[in-house]
């Protein structure tokens, strides 16, 4: 069944991961800012200094694609460190990879980060969304397996871990990337766009599936820790049961289940508990976009 997805995400045009659109450098269409005027939005005003985690917090689960058990630990990091993955459990020494666009080695059904030696951490987008959405600038993400645990398919467990660790202000001012003019990348009827916006960061998503269970859904959000927690942190990843055999044969979705994925067939939703939101699929696309946009390396001011 041919599906059509329309996506307009505030920020970088590298967000269309599932569409195979290549990640692009921001170039002349953005600039860095270390201060934000008082009229630039609640998120920017409230968090004027860089933040990190007060302590460590660990979650345990399985990888949605690998099916392997994995432990993930969030921890503090110094000023200007950014978000850094630390791959442990290897035969050799632990390896670090910064959460930036240049670290992306694959976008086939998930965002995979790595270095010159190869892939290190897959399915990074949900934990990155939680860290960016909750306003954490600098943190380490230790993972002892090849993939971030899927948990319940949303970012809720990572938000809970951030709450457990606590957030503290640091000594340096927060820096931003401000979008200066519109830029669009398109593939067929699908596109990703970034444009200027004076109110912090706003994401707008529209998806349109031929499958009537999903259909056309819209969602928009002015991002803040409160709105992220309330509006999208609990939105789960989703997929069609008809795609299962194809995904399994390609080595994907080996850890997927009704406990961590919204599953539907041609006519109905198969999860007994139903949707968490009427437009949960669009909300989850926004979650994925926020996570991928964290690879810009700094918070975005745009829409």
Predicted regions and their residues:
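Positively charged N-terminal leader segments that act as targeting/secretion signals
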Residues: 3-6
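C-terminal regulatory domains involved in ligand/effector binding and gene-expression control
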Residues: 41-138, 142-303
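Serine residues within intrinsically disordered or low-complexity segments
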Residues: 34, 38-40
């Amino acid at each position: 069944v041919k599906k059509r997805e329309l996506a307009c995400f505030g920020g970088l045009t590298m967000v269309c991961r599932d569409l195979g659109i290549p990640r692009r450098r921001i170039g002349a269409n953005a600039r860095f800012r270390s201060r934000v005027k008082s009229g630039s939005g609640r998120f920017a005003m409230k968090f004027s200094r860089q933040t990190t985690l007060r302590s460590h917090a660990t979650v345990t689960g399985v990888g949605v694609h690998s099916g392997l058990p994995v432990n993930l630990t969030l921890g503090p990091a110094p000023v200007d460190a950014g978000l850094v993955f630390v791959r442990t459990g290897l035969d050799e020494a632990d390896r670090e990879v910064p959460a930036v666009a240049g670290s992306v080695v694959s976008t086939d059904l998930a965002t995979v980060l790595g270095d010159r030696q190869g892939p290190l951490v897959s399915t990074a987008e949900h934990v990155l969304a939680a860290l960016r959405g909750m306003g954490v600038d600098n943190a380490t993400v230790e993972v002892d397996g090849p993939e971030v645990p899927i948990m319940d398919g949303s970012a809720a467990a990572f938000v809970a871990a951030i709450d457990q660790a606590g957030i503290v202000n640091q000594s340096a001012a927060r820096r931003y990337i401000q979008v200066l003019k519109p830029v669009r990348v398109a593939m067929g009827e699908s596109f990703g766009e970034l444009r200027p916006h004076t109110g912090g960061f706003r994401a707008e998503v529209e998806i349109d599936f031929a499958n009537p269970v999903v259909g056309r859904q819209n969602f928009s959000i002015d991002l803040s820790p409160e709105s992220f927690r309330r509006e999208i942190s609990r939105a789960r990843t989703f997929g069609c049961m008809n795609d299962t055999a194809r995904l399994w044969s390609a080595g994907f979705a080996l850890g997927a289940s009704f406990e961590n994925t919204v599953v539907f067939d041609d006519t109905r939703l198969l999860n007994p508990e139903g949707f968490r939101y009427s437009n949960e699929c669009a909300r989850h696309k926004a979650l994925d976009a926020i996570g991928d946009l964290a690879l810009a390396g700094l918070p975005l001011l745009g829409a």
